[in-house]
Amino acid sequence: MAKMSALSIFAIFIILVLVIFEIPEIEAHDSECLKEYGGDVGFGFCAPKIFPTICYRNCQKDKGANGGKCLWGEGGKVKCLCDFCSNESFNQFISLT
């Protein structure tokens, strides 16, 4: 029975190590997917009433991306991030709050 318990503990330890080493790869994947379109693009580029946003359309047209997401910062600053991995048009806004 003690042999089975030691084997179970070893298996759990190996699984935890694999999970811990996998986490940085997931974070790096996001940075590879989202590339900035170019500086503070302003409110009109990401106006919520326009669907899909100009950011989304221009990222597809100008950069060859699958789409674009708007990142709203403090003081009304807006950045457009071109998304090269996902083409979900329903999730176009990222909030820092």
From Swiss-Prot:
A GO molecular function assigned to this protein is: sodium channel inhibitor activity
Describe what happens upon changing N87K.
In strain: cv. Cvi-1, cv. Fe-1a, cv. Nd-1 and cv. Wei-0
The entry's cellular-component GO terms read: extracellular region; secretory vesicle
Q: Where is this site: Reactive bond?
A: K49, I50
Q: What is its main location?
A: secreted
Instruction: Tell me yes or no: is Disulfide bond among this UniProt entry's keywords.
Output: yes
Listed disulfide bonds for this chain? C33-C85, C46-C70, C55-C80, C59-C82
Q: Write out the GO biological process terms.
A: defense response to fungus; killing of cells of another organism
Q: Where in the cell is it found?
A: Secreted
Signal sequence span per UniProt? 1-28
Return the SMART domains for the record: Knot1
Please give one Pfam family short name. Toxin_3
Q: Which keywords does UniProt give here?
A: Antimicrobial, Disulfide bond, Fungicide, Plant defense, Secreted, Signal
Q: What is the effect of changing K3T?
A: In strain: cv. Cvi-1, cv. Fe-1a, cv. Nd-1 and cv. Wei-0
Per the record, the similarity remark reads: Belongs to the DEFL family. Protease inhibitor I18 (RTI/MTI-2) subfamily.
What is the name attached to this protein's record? Defensin-like protein 196
Originating species: Arabidopsis thaliana
- What is the taxonomic lineage of the source species? Eukaryota, Viridiplantae, Streptophyta, Embryophyta, Tracheophyta
What's the encoding gene here? ATTI4
